[in-house]
Regions:
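Long, hydrophobic, well-ordered secondary-structure blocks that form the structural core
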Residues: 91-103, 112
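Short, solvent-exposed loop/turn segments at secondary-structure boundaries
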Residues: 102-107, 208-210
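Short acidic (Asp/Glu) patches
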Residues: 74-75, 106-113
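Catalytic cores of soluble, metal-dependent hydrolases
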Residues: 2-69, 73-90, 121-122, 126, ...
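Conserved acidic E/D residue at the C-terminus of a beta-strand in Rossmann-like folds
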Residues: 95, 129-131
Length: 290
């Protein structure tokens, strides 16, 4: 493990892949860099409890309240990062996918919400901005419907003419989502919120990711996180979702990953990094501000 000396004491950049490069002046302070490239392939997309605990034993001491990491293929690490929290809190996720799949693979980017709900301090997980097919029928049958029905998991997908959503989902539209968001935040019983941002919640114009893009614009995230800061305490958070070339440690990860991932759109490396860096320069400062 190699650690740089730069960055705020409250932030860290966990380098698991090649999603980010900071070779030019930026409008924010780059977090302390922690090299974890050797661990990346074994953790990517799906992994085991053994690998999770090994990773936590090696890197847990460098976790900070706010963590920048790479592809959304690593989003399940959020369920690990929140172990730092010491008080009851709500997780608010901006994501184009519900990440709620109940299945035999215990640790995966598509099911991390269930691991987070196992944490006794997590009062609720709310996922805003799901636009892919997983909330539609029959794919939603793979989701954690019991948690949705109990209210412990709140999923707000974008409305679609193709989908007739059940009453345990909370559909939104571009015209009304801010009103719904305000109402939801004002209903939360605790003031402590952990915010996790997957850049795939953004439209194609605002992010290049390994997954399908959503409908939010950067201005939407700017508004939402600033609103949160007025109404609640952001006690921690993370940001992932930037595209990176896939590297897996096992054939099973490779086969499953290739079957599950969408076809990547053609974008030059230079344009990809430029688009994602612009997103980071907007979201990271407002997420991590004191």
């Amino acid at each position: 493990m190699r650690v740089s000396n730069q960055g705020s004491a409250e932030t860290v950049w966990l380098v698991l892949d090649d999603a980010w490069e900071f070779n030019e002046p930026l409008s924010f302070e780059v977090p302390k860099r922690v090299e974890a490239l050797e661990s990346g392939p074994s953790l990517r997309y799906i992994t085991s409890q053994r690998m999770i605990e090994r990773f936590c034993a090696e890197f847990g001491e460098i976790f900070r309240p706010f963590i920048l990491f790479g592809s959304g293929d690593f989003h399940h690490l959020t369920a690990l990062f929140i172990r730092q929290m010491k008080e009851p809190f709500v997780i608010l996720s901006f994501d184009n996918h519900p990440d709620w799949v109940v299945g035999p693979v215990h640790w995966s980017c598509g099911g991390w919400v269930n691991r987070a709900l196992e944490n006794p301090l997590v009062q609720q997980v709310a996922v805003w901005g799901c636009g892919n097919f997983e909330c539609g029928f029959p794919w939603r049958l793979r989701g954690n419907r019991s948690a949705c029905r109990s209210g412990r998991l709140w999923v707000a997908p974008w409305r679609s003419e193709k989908n007739d959503y059940p009453d345990w989902l909370h559909p939104i539209s571009t015209a009304d989502w801010r009103t719904a968001f305000i109402r939801f935040i004002e209903s939360i019983r605790t003031s402590a919120i952990y915010v996790t941002v997957d850049l795939d919640c953004l439209a194609e114009s605002d992010a290049v990711t390994n997954w399908e893009n959503g409908r939010f614009l950067l201005a939407d995230l700017d508004w939402a996180i600033n609103f949160l800061r007025k109404k609640a305490r952001i006690i921690g958070g993370d940001l992932s979702g930037a595209f990176s070339p896939t590297r897996y440690a096992s054939w099973f990860q490779s086969v499953a990953g290739r079957l599950d991932h969408p076809r990547q759109r053609s974008v030059t490396d230079r344009k990809r990094r430029s688009i994602n860096l612009r997103a980071l320069e907007v979201v990271w400062p407002i997420l991590t501000q004191a």
